[in-house]
Amino acid sequence: MRVIVKGGVWRNTEDEILKAAISKYGKNQWARISSLLVRKTPKQCKARWYEWLDPSIKKTEDEKLLHLAKLMPTQWRTIAPIVGRTATQCLERYQKLLDDAEARDNEELGLGAGEDESSKPATDARGLRPGEIDTDPETRPARPDPIDMDDDEKEMLSEARARLANTQGKKAKRKARERQLEEARRLAFLQKKRELKAAGINLRAKPKKKGMDYNADIPFEKQPAPGFYDVTEEQAKVHAAPVGSTLRALEGKRKQELDEIEERKKRQKKGDGKSNQTQQFVAAREAQIKKLKEQEQIIRRRKLNLPIPQVGERELEDIVKIGQAGELARELVGDGNKATEGLLGEYEALGQAKMARTPRTAPQQDNVMAEARNLRNMMAAQTPLLGEENTPLHGPSVGTGFEGATPRHDVAATPNPLATSARGGVLTSTRTVPGVGTTPLRTPFRDDLNINDDASVYGETPMNDRRRLAESRRALKAGFAALPKPENNFELAETEEDEEEAEEAEPLTEEDAAERDARLKAAREEEERRELERRSTVIKKGLPRPVNVNTYKLLDDLNSAIVEQTDEEMAAAFKLVNLEVAMLMKHDSIAHPLPGTSTPGGLASEYDMPEDDFVAEAKNAIHTELANALGLPGASDEHLRLAIGAAAEENEAAFAEAWAEEREGLVYSPSTRTWVDKTSLSPEELSACYAAMINASRDRVIAEATKAAKAEKKLGKQLGGYQTLNEKAKKAIVDVMEEIHQTKRDMETFLMLKGIEEAAAPARLEKIREEVAVLEKRERDLQARYAELNDRRRENLAAIEQLEEDKIVLAAQVALEAQEGEVADGDVDMNGA
């Protein structure tokens, strides 16, 4: 008898059968799945799926595994779903990587004794010793199928193919057969019923005792709640009867018929491809395996990252044209005098490019091995309480880093020879010398005629020259400072040019970008603040001002208002003030124009803005003079503002009266757009002025009304909800107040009733007490009468009982006497006989 031990290495055939069975039966029926595999148990099938065949498992995540182990040590249950493996696989792979790192370190230090078969771990399926069995074959790759398979394997494969191809089981067939019988029974009953009806026999439907008539009633019907809309028209709508339609057309195709049609199509399609299925199976399997291998190779292949092109097509055309022009010039010179041939050097642009080669890509570090070494060193480290040196780790540039949950990847790109500096014939990919950038310059350095001296440096800039000069000066000053103390002191005055050059010299260390941006931002904000402070008070406070300013007319009006002064200096000072006011108003109309101005845009103001220091001195002088005039020397701005406000309030009434009187004599002239005196105008001009004022007032009223209507409409939209809520709240408040008033009236009524009841209660209580006393007396009399009668009743009952007893005794005596008489008579008869 052959004994089969289930288990062992998995084969490709078993993997495919397992995947097909899982797709049909799911991931819960492992016993049924394992019945398709002769040599595997349900537990092994489940382990094979979750440990190897699950598509969510990724098998090349060593770098991510080490990175997560560094971030979350010993938390394998947390790391497993992130990596896409199980916790056991993560732990085994982690230990294997540490062992590999240790073995490599031993090899580098010369401590390894060489790798042989005995040194290989037993957990590696490829390194098993003879006679050993893999303890965890579910986590290993499948073994290829042999060309000549065993009979058991062929039988298993054919049985699995037949079972998996059968989509309908025994239960499904039985259900289909029951449905067919039920349909045949129904059709036979209908045929019988029709024949009896044709013969004149009507079968009366037998009502079911329990259940529902589904032809007459609607099961689980719920009448809809009456709504707000009238549905009488819909209820009165007449539906046409299905006259001329068959029952089959009304019912449509049943689900069983649809399933049969679908099954018939599947069988037909399967029958068409069944002939060449056997030949196509092997070819399709080989093509699928080949495709998977190609995808694996593509995944392993490194991504090609080319540098950005430094020269475009148009630049290449320009370079070709420049080269052709140089060659033509050289041919022209070569055809002429030989003495001029030496004036042209060899400036071929492709001279060095012919010998140039693409630099080699910098070698990449093995991040997996570096992280494994770091983790191994950290595991072997002692406690920090001992005070020893830190654990030796690789630099921050090597490894996966600590930036996030995913490891850091350094993309390797091919170096660009055009963007790589070539000094001394050696191409370097990094910038080692400051001063010259690694990007190609616009004009290459070619000096065949030795025009530049040897001391000049290629790529120097004026900044580098100034920096070198400042460095030499500092070195010279340091040397002078190191000299011994002089016996005679001499002072040398540094010229202004040297001071300016020293100020222009830049510092040795480059300023940080963040500090520079902060300094420039602070400077801009300070300049903006000063610009805002330089504005006039009218602009700052937004006071009304004229749209257009005529400087000459305004200056004439202001100068004409100057009272004739005996002091000519005071009059000249007033004129200077008026000139400054007119120029400032003109500057405001240009720098801050109002809508409707006639000043063209982009016009620069001719006003010379005074310096900030002069303005500050003038404000201080005005402040001091105003404080002295108000009798508050040394007062602050706030105190002066309060004092001026108090003085203005005292004269407000007088000012209003004076302005009203002055206002009566002024009208607005539309021609000059100013307020003029009435007496200086003719009647026609005065009428035109009044008409213009009326029109302006009407326009202003219309504008204000339009604005008010828009505001009302806008507020109506915004406050419509609030108004509704207000109405509801008002109604609720009114209802509550009415309820309060009604409650107050009820309370007053009940208080009045309380007073009446308190007044009438004593009399009623006294009357009730008298009635109670009468009732109590009557009750006592009746109770006494009842006790007397009860005693007499008991006496009578006792007498009756005594008489009954006497009667019984008397009857007994009579009977006894009669018996004695009979006995005596008997004795006499006996004696006589």
Swiss-Prot record:
CDD domains: SANT (cd00167), SANT_CDC5_II (cd11659). Residues 30-53, 76-98 bind DNA. One of its GO terms (cellular component) is Prp19 complex. GO terms for biological process: mRNA cis splicing, via spliceosome. The keyword Cytoplasm applies. It comes from the Eukaryota. Residues 245-306, 722-808 form a coiled coil. Residues 109-150, 248-280, 428-447, 480-534 are annotated as: Disordered. Its main location: cytoplasm. Pfam families: Myb_Cef, Myb_DNA-binding. Residues 126-146, 250-273, 515-534 have a biased composition (Basic and acidic residues). Residues 493-514 have a biased composition (Acidic residues). One of its GO terms (molecular function) is DNA binding. InterPro entries: CDC5L/Cef1, Cdc5p/Cef1_C, Homeodomain-like_sf, Myb_dom, SANT/Myb, SANT_CDC5L_II. Keywords: Coiled coil, Cytoplasm, DNA-binding, mRNA processing, mRNA splicing, Nucleus, Repeat, Spliceosome. It is found in: Cytoplasm; Nucleus. The keyword DNA-binding applies. Belongs to the CEF1 family. Associated with the spliceosome. Involved in pre-mRNA splicing and cell cycle control. This is Pre-mRNA-splicing factor CEF1. The gene is CEF1.
